[in-house]
Amino acid sequence: MIDPYQKGKVYTMNKKELVKLAAAVTAAFTISAAAGFGVLSSSFGTGEKSYAAETAVTQTVEITRTQAADTTSTSETGTTANELNMTTDGAIDTTDIFTDRDLEQTADLSEAKTYTVSDSQTIEITSEGVYVITGSASNASIIVEAGDEDKVQLVLDGVTITNDSIPCIYVKSADKVFVTTTDSENSLSVTGTFTADGDTNTDAVIFSKDDLVLNGVGTLNIQSSDNGVTCKDDMKITGGTINIACEADALEANDSIRIADGEINISTNKDALHAENDDDDTVGYIYICGGTLKALAGDDAIHATTIIQIDGGKLDLNAHEGLEATWIQINDGTINIAASDDAINAAYKSAKISPTAEFNGGYVTIVMGSGDTDAVDSNGNLIITGGTLDITAQSPFDYDGTCQKTGGTLIINGTETDTISNQMMGGGKGGRTGGRKGW
């Protein structure tokens, strides 16, 4: 009989997947391994299983800032917002969460200005428009300091920038900035200790104080001694291929991270996706409705203060913890998690909502390490109405509130079951046991 908790089974069963990801991320960069970035040593699940979407429940908390649609068309390709696989009655209000322009993958270059980066020089952009960036340089920076209502589109067309201590792209002010790749390879890296801009800790290769959209049809490689991309407002990813290798958080935002499409590959010693606002615990959420994400993270793969809502996409996550937020809602998608602590952890991160782990659809595969680890850990309630949960773990569930199972398929250590056993092995990392219920 095979012991499903044997360490070798958990951590070596998909070794080739890990090797492929690590190679894909590191080989994409023009900076060699001499920069000193660490690589972890676990594995991804394959997760090649079909699934049927289920209807989401209707409990809603409105934490999304409603934005007027961008009316200027700048593209020949891309989907529209009403074509996305979005749950309209989920945890997050998805109304206007993406504009049509967010989803456009190519820029209108008819009135674009072109700049070529050069060593130790700064390109300053102070007004709305489309700007094509080309060339290779060291210690160069693109600084956007435009008006509060200006939308700026930076079109990266075969750009390589290698810096010692300053962001390659620094958005000081604008309404929204689009970083769009052409059908080209673009590499941005910072190898040394970041230098602050006055009181602003500019700690990322791309650092934005305002809304940021990453999209396009090409490849963007980011390598950092700290964070990969930091946004102090809302960050959206709607297309392109993005490869990030960094020491700290790969994608970090204050208000939200929203992913509609694209191919994202991350190797980091901290969090792959991190949304947190120290001043407002009603924001700091992560929404995913498409694309692919492969993340190898030393801490959390996806971490949010308030809500993680997944409506679609394919996620392969290998981390200390897979998903961590106050309310985690999975409505669709294919999600594979290999974790050494809790794979899914609904903990007290926000005082505005109650910890809930909720499964309404999709196919979720979880493989846990041995020891005091939980596949699904909720400091509040556990809700299962649909989808498939395929768990290999000593402790499949640990919840402090109530459990409601009205549908879905549950597979525990290879056996389909309708029984949920509460392990009660203690609160998850960063959470508190017992306590607040409701809003």
Predicted regions and their residues:
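A composition-driven surface/loop motif
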Residues: I2-W439
